[in-house]
Amino acid sequence: MYEPKPEHRFTFGLWTVGNVGRDPFGDAVRERLDPVYVGHKLAELGVHGVNLHDEDLIPRGTPPAERDQIVRRFKRALDETGLKVPMVTGNLFSDPGFKDGGFTSRDPWVRAYAFRKSLETMDLGAELGAEIYVVWPGREGAEVEATGKARKVWDWVREPLNFMAAYAEDQGYGYRFALEPKPNEPRGDIYFATVGSMLALIHTLERPERFGLNPEFAHETMAGLNFVHAVAQALDAGKLLHIDLNGQRMNRFDQDLRFGSENLKAAFLLVDLLESSGYQGPRHFDAHALRTEDEEGVWAFARGCMRTYLILKERAEAFREDPEVKELLAAYYQEDPAALPLMDPYSHEKAEALKRAELPLEAKRHRGYALERLDQLAVEYLLGVRG
């Protein structure tokens, strides 16, 4: 019942299960895994696809002939396993040249390098069949505001995004670009901090129809925000192209914990939203095994992410089918049809009628909404003691 299959559209990045456990205070605790080996292992686990940064597959500085050999070998593994590459993304954060930004560096040569690296990653992704290109502006931020740079970065980031969309069109690539917000880390503050800020940016681009969002559970939670609300807004805008799932404690550094290991109720409500919304995109686990783990623990982590998602999916579906839940929701959303015409599209006459209308507010002020009972039922389904 909780066994992952490719049709569940679960994906992992090469950098997730390939994480070697290095952190700011300690060296690697695991060996780097061969991308071909990772692909075969993920396929054995029932995964739909594997995502990658350019440098996850092709180390920086690799000569062209060697690069082509690496790609051929990886494509052969994809053919052998049936694994897809739904998404690629450019690493614009590791190279020391990006220390003060890639797209938003004050140095035009660094910006040009970020442009070129992005185009090369698009070419790589097209070879591998990718349809989504994620843009994560991890270095596009600041610690020192005295530069006044915050007034300039919006044009600087629009230029490459417009360029990349035009390049995709020129090359016949079907990419849609998923922008990934984050409030901070590795920079003290990142300019493109939340789902709302990215949605606002998209509408200033030349080809907004090619752009959407890749929200991440941890990133909105780091800022103390409600991730379910963020995803719902992206869905409402028709801009949820991809999603990063993991676990995160509020107001901490980016922990990238196993999905559902923290904030379990939020994870339950997120799965409920995704599965009831018609979202057809990948369910990508942008997380990694704890530093305490060896390779066996890495695969236990990957299985755990998917199993938890499927358990929460089953629990959410059972919750929505519960007769008492349906009754409570029907009562909650019951509307008096007499009130609805007061909120019809504006006209001068309707505005005057609204100001004259008798509103039965006294009864509304004393009404209870039974949300305590509804929430208790959700908790009981989550705990597995009901349904």
UniProtKB/Swiss-Prot annotation:
Binds 2 magnesium ions per subunit. One of its GO terms (molecular function) is magnesium ion binding. The keyword Flavoprotein does not apply. Mg(2+) 1 binds at E180, E216, D244, D286. PROSITE patterns: XYLOSE_ISOMERASE (PS51415). SUPFAM superfamilies: Xylose isomerase-like. GO terms for cellular component: cytoplasm. Its EC number is 5.3.1.5. One of its GO terms (biological process) is D-xylose metabolic process. The keyword Chloroplast does not apply. It comes from the Bacteria. Mg(2+) 2 binds at E216, H219, D254, D256. The active site is at H53, D56. Belongs to the xylose isomerase family. This is Xylose isomerase. It comes from Thermus caldophilus. The lineage of its organism: Bacteria, Thermotogati, Deinococcota, Deinococci, Thermales. The gene is xylA.
